[in-house]
Amino acid sequence: MGDIAAQTAEADLFGRVEARGIEAIPAAERHGAPRDLAFLWAGAFVNYASLFTASLLTTYYGLGVWDGLVATALGTAAAALILGLLSNTGPRSGLPQIVFTRGIFGFRGSYLGAGLTLFLATGWFAVDCIIAAQAGAQLFGGGNRWLTFGLVLVIAAISVGVAVFGHQTIKVLEAYGAVAFAVLSAALFLSLAPQFNWAQGAVVTGSNYAGAFVLGFMTCFALVASWYPFASDYSRYLPAASSTRSVTLWPVVGIAVPMILLGLFGLLLPTIDAKLAADQGVLAVISAHAPTWVAIPFFLFIVVGEIWANYLDVYTAGLVTLAMGIKLQRWQTALGCGLLGTGLATYAVLVSDFHIAYEDFLILTYLWAPAWAAVVLLSFFVFEHKARPALALGAWLAGTASSLLFVNYANLFGNLVAKPTFFNDPLIAGLHGADFSGLVSVGVAAAVYWSGRQWGRA
C-alpha cells in the first residue's frame, strides 16, 4: 500500500512535472473529489477574459446592464452544463478528452478534433498574452500598440519558459489565483461603484434588440464552449466511482458564479465612459477612473495570472500533439504553441482591433465545438455499447456545415473588407444580426446522430 501511495504522489504533485501522458490514469493514482472541479474551472474563469467578454454586450452590442446580465447568465449556464456533462468522460475512462473520442470518431477521425483543439489552445494562448500585455501597458500609460506588442513577446517567452509542470500544479495555481483575483476585483468594483450607471438600458430597440440579445447570449456561450475539448483533461484523475451528478454540477458552479459576478462588473464598466471603452477597451476605463492603489495591483495580477493561465493551453496542446502521434517533447510542444500563439497575438495587436479579433476567435469556435460535443455526449450517455465512427463523424460534419448558413459573417469579417456582402445576408438581416450557428450546430448534429443510431437498430 505504501508503494501505491508513493506512486500516486510521484505521478501528480504540485511543482513537479506530471509523469503521465495520454494513457489512462490507473485506479491507484486517482484522487480528489468532484468539487475540486469547481475551483479549477473557477480559476479558468475568474479572470479578465470573463469581464471583457461581458463588457462587449454594453460596449458594442447595445444591450443594457440588466438584460445584458440575463444574456450572460443564460449563455454561460447553457454552455457550462454541456462542459460539466463532458467532464464525466474523465473519471469513467481516465483519458484526456481527445483521446477518449477515439472510441467515438475512430482513431483517424479523432485527428480532426485534435487538430482543431490545437487551434483552440493556440488561440487561447494568444488571447491570454494580449490580455496580459494590455494590462501591463496600462502601467505605462497604455494606448501604444508597439509597447503592447513588445510586452506580448516578453509574456509569450515567459509563458513558454514556465510551461513545464502538470495537472496538480495547474489545479493549485488556478484555485489560489482565483481567490486572489476575486479579492482584487471586489476591491476595484467597490472603488468604482459610485461611478457606475446601474440603470443604463439598451440602446437598440424592437427586432434589433432581440438580435443583440441572442448575439450576447451566443458570445458568452462561445467563451465556455471553447473549453469543451479540454473537459476531461482536468477530470481524469478523479476516482471512477465519482457521482455523475457531482461531476456535472461542480464545473457549472465553478464557471457560472465567476462569469455572472465578473460579467456584471464588465457590463457596468462601459457605463462610466462609453467612448473610452469603445475606443481603447475597459482596461483604459479602469486606468483612467480607478484609484491607483487598487488599479496597479489589479493590472499586475492580470499579467501574472494570464501567464500561468497559459499553461492550461500548453498542457492541453501537449496532450493533443501526443494524441495525433506527433513525437514531440513537452518543451517542443510549448515552443510550437508559443510561436503560433505569438503570431496570432501579433496580428491582433498590430493589424486588427483586439475586440474584433477576439470575437472572431470565439465565433470560429462555434463552427465545430458544439456539434462535436453533441455527438460525444450522445455516444457516452446513450449509445455507449457500440461505436459508429463513420456516423459520428458524419453527424459532426453535418452539424458544422449546417451552422455555416447561420453565421453572421459581417460581424466576423467586417473588419477585413469594406462593405462586405455574404451569401446569407438576407437571412442574417431577417434575424436582425443574431447568430444562431452554435444552436443549429448542436441541433443538427444531435438529430443526425440520433436518427442514424435508431435507424441502425431497426
Labelled PLM ranges:
Residues 114-118, 141-165, 179-190, 220-231, ...:
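Transmembrane alpha-helical segments of multi-pass small-molecule transport proteins
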Residues 71-105, 114-120, 126:
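Juxtamembrane transmembrane-helix boundary signature
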Residues 30-34, 165-178, 229-261, 276-285, ...:
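Hydrophobic, small-residue-rich membrane helices and short re-entrant helix-turn-helix hairpins
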